[in-house]
Amino acid sequence: MRTSDGGARLLDQIMKLALGTVQFGLDYGVTNQSGKVEESEIEDILDFAKSNGINILDTASGYGNSEQVLGGVGVDDYQIITKTTSLKHGVDEVIKGFYQSLKYLNQKSIDGLLIHDINEVNDKEFDDLFERLNELKQQGLVNKIGFSIYTPEQVNFLLENFDFDIIQLPFNVFDTRLVEGGQLQELKKKNIEIHARSVFLQGVLLDFDNLSSYFSTWRGRFDKYQEVVEKSGMSLLEYALNFALNTKGIDKVLVGVNSEQQLREIIQSAKKEGKSSAHPINDVNLLNPSLWRV
């Protein structure tokens, strides 16, 4: 069957999506009103994702019981990316944690393993840990190793000091620091696979009307942004998603959902043609959810 250029583009957009699973194990997101996702709903979400060409799941041992849930419902048809446990109890415990993740996920190997806490690079045992992760890769237990990061400075440090395969980083219409600083381009020069998370800024970019008073500092910027989105003819969801999907260099765009219906809306939005642009707000108190006082 032949596919038109337009149809191929839409398929590429959808296949660029990856499914985050933190909501499967934890209450997550400042706009999340429904809490942790029920297992029956998770099965529906995964079935719908698979039928629409989404084949990457992102999880972590720190996401509550999400690994156990995924292993229970069955994820053999997916490429799995998980993250390390804390290094504070030693390298051996991190490696044990990886094998526990394989057991929970009911997998013999996975696609990717990320260092979850980037600050651990300062630990005296980190070089040993990274060497052990490379050994897991050589043994065929994991295909790619890399990092989950928060700032451009962290990317600079990693590029100077480590050879790695994959990175997960924050990116959205408000947070384009890694484009402006050139880090995205440097990562691609080294053929490092780039996964963008926080494309909806934990839901902030989808609903400006029901935010806590913490976000009042940026109310004027939010209002101006909403005016731009309205003029574009796109919804808030379509605009934010379009921006991430169409940014050169980003290989996968992570989205998290609480229901099959939300995933349907995201996939439909990925098909929307339109032009969105960056609206940078260079304030880490907004861009880094770990700093939010909500």
Language model features: what each stretch is:
Residues 77-90, 112-116:
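A short, structured active-site edge motif that brings together acidic residues
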Residues 70-79, 99-108, 158-162, 186-189:
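Acidic (Asp/Glu)-rich catalytic clusters
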Residues 103-121:
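Active-site groove signature of glycoside hydrolases
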Residues 51-54, 107-110, 142, 164, ...:
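A structural motif
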Residues 34-48, 90-105, 150-157:
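Short, acidic/polar
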Residues 118-287, 291-293:
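Beta/alpha (TIM)-barrel catalytic core signal, keyed to glycine-rich beta->alpha loops juxtaposed to Asp/Glu
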Residues 27-39, 83-92, 122:
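Active-site mouth loops of central-metabolism enzymes
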Residues 2-78:
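N-terminal binding-site loop/beta-alpha segment at the start of enzyme catalytic domains
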